[in-house]
Amino acid sequence: MITGIHHVAIIVSSEKSVDFYKELGFQEILRKVREYDSIVLLDATGIRLELFVDPSHPPRSEKPEQLGLRHLAIKIDNFDELIKKYNCDTPKYDWLGERYVYIPDPDGLLVEIHE
């Protein structure tokens, strides 16, 4: 029986992405440096991201509709403050009636921010 999602692993090209997710509210709880990359484990209220920091990986496709992770969606309590900070477009409403915006991380992965 599944009891939850343990973590989401994302390959990123630099510490800029680590900083981006920290600015969204994630906290670094563990870091491991290996010969070929670094692994940074982030947590926000039990939601964990495992970032593999490696500048040698090819860049992400510009088309999010390809196979694999399309976007990461998170819910925050400072929605209006965040959309001003990132100069976002006017928020939209999803099919559940919730406000959201998309913000690309430094490597182009879309992060869907929900109120």
What is the predicted function of each stretch?
Residues 37, 56-62:
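A short, acidic/glycine-rich surface segment
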Residues 40, 87-115:
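Vicinal oxygen chelate
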Residues 3, 36, 67, 96-98:
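Loop/turn position at the start of each blade in beta-propeller repeats
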Residues 14-15, 79-80, 106:
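Residues at or immediately preceding the N-termini of alpha-helices
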Residues 10-49:
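Core segments of cupin and vicinal oxygen chelate
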Residues 62-93:
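Mid-chain, well-packed structural core segment of small domains
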Residues 1-18, 70-72:
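N-terminal beta-strand motif that seeds the catalytic metal site of vicinal oxygen chelate
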